[in-house]
Amino acid sequence: MNASSWSLRNLPWFRATLAQWRYALRNTIAMCLALTVAYYLNLDEPYWAMTSAAVVSFPTVGGVISKSLGRIAGSLLGAIAALLLAGHTLNEPWFFLLSMSAWLGFCTWACAHFTNNVAYAFQLAGYTAAIIAFPMVNITEASQLWDIAQARVCEVIVGILCGGMMMMILPSSSDATALLTALKNMHARLLEHASLLWQPETTDAIRAAHEGVIGQILTMNLLRIQAFWSHYRFRQQNARLNALLHQQLRMTSVISSLRRMLLNWPSPPGATREILEQLLTALASSQTDVYTVARIIAPLRPTNVADYRHVAFWQRLRYFCRLYLQSSQELHRLQSDVDDHARLPRTSGLARHTDNAEAMWSGLRTFCTLMMIGAWSIASQWDAGANALTLAAISCVLYSAVAAPFKSLSLLMRTLVLLSLFSFVVKFGLMVQISDLWQFLLFLFPLLATMQLLKLQMPKFAALWGQLIVFMGSFIAVTNPPVYNFADFLNDNLAKIVGVALAWLAFAILRPGSDARKSRRHIRALRRDFVDQLSRHPTLSESEFESLTYHHVSQLSNSQDALARRWLLRWGIVLLNCSHVVWQLRDWESRSDPLSRVRDNCISLLRGVMSERGVQQKSLAATLEELQRICDSLARHHQPAARELAAIVWRLYCSLSQLEQAPPQGTLAS
């Protein structure tokens, strides 16, 4: 190691930028202030206020507000549950254990059905009840229940208020800026994505890019929610933001649909690729208008109206251009703060799907884990069993919803071991020698500031530093009055580590469903919703089914099972393209009764091919032949409406043809 690596420039305090110092100082002051206020309010465990301030330390105002609301609601609900359950079962330890395990299992199940601050509220309701109720097993007076519950809630609220106040004093980046930047970047990336997908090749890079675009658009919904909570203007523009997200999803679908047509088009015009690249280059410019676009794509206009392939591609390309220009105009209105609510209709938020089987399994895992640890604690008369139960409850509730629970639990184990060693040195080497809180704060403030800076400067270890910051308060355990008992300290820390280790064991025995099994469940749900789309009065609108389909696809975006991801993506895109054709057929009107019967026949053909169980290959082959025959017949028809219908039916043919290599029912392998 050379001497330059030890220079002052490489120290975290000198490497930090102004934004990093603002973030570190804001969170450090909030945590120290929360600890001080809770300590002088004579709350018995003021370190929970410091932990609460650390948890809500989001980099944006909207994130702090939404998470704080969820934390307050969850803490109140958890405190009420703890009072009711512990108050009625305090003298019956087995019944107490059963009721608390059932409550935490319910909270684990419920948080899987929601997103954002609602899911966070249910998580808090679960482990706040655990934090309050499990230590109550050693008390004898029922009146202490209320004292402990209100102390925990007050500590949480103090931490939230301190975090919110420091966010107002030292504000960070604007949620509005982050959202608008993300929308503009995605708007530009859609053109790059179109250029990639309209290539004739089929590679894993194309699939990964498509999954990435879908995931980024769905992630922007979180930015929209944060902007909603932090800016009055974005609360007024919420309908427009929802419509913009739906538009970007629709453009993603149209890009995919155009790719299918290009791959199934035997002889496209020779200059198609060059014209498409010229079009994408022009759309990237903010000065491009509809007339410029019309001049560029004019050479692609079909000269033979009987060429239904050319007509279908032309119509879909024009639709994509119109969507992109409309989205550009809406983004410009958002940036310029134009108050015009009549431009876009009110649109619902992005739909989502809950895997009920996985949610039930997670709730059952939490219930069984706590029953096992509780039974062991009761049978062995372990004094620190409450700490093991509390950490196991937190681990089961928090990590049931993550993609890699074993990695997260292993990281938490490492965090607890490091904090046990660190807190031993701090508690019995420093804290026993000081008598005033301000002396301890002189040590705590620079320590927290340095840890916050390291979290920002070491992204590879950001999760570790974040957990060290959040859990440090409960290990140092600044109480009022202070307690220094080495036996209790060792027993409590050992119990916390054992609780997480047993939660890890529970995840190993009651393992989450494999990605292949999850993929089959998502595909089955997609097919079930698509069958509903074929009915005369579908439950979901076209946009709702589209966002729901993309939500299904995004659920395995981090999966290592390439086959499961590939077939979930393929089924989602196929069914989505077919649903767009079905909606267009449903809206298509003709005065010719024979043509209307042809349209109805196309929809009925889909009903014969698709079911919740899968696709029948024999029926699929016959349906594709029939659709091709319908296209050829309509192309020779004398009515313009018939040739228009032929173009729509050919799009349906292109979408369905991708399922010719679909795996057998119940598997993901051919």
Swiss-Prot record:
InterPro entries: PHBA_efflux_AaeB/fusaric-R. Keywords: Cell membrane, Membrane, Transmembrane, Transmembrane helix, Transport. This is Uncharacterized transporter YdhK. It is found in: Cell membrane. Pfam families: FUSC. PANTHER family: MULTIDRUG RESISTANCE PROTEIN MDTO, P-HYDROXYBENZOIC ACID EFFLUX PUMP SUBUNIT-RELATED. It comes from the Bacteria. It comes from Escherichia coli O157:H7.
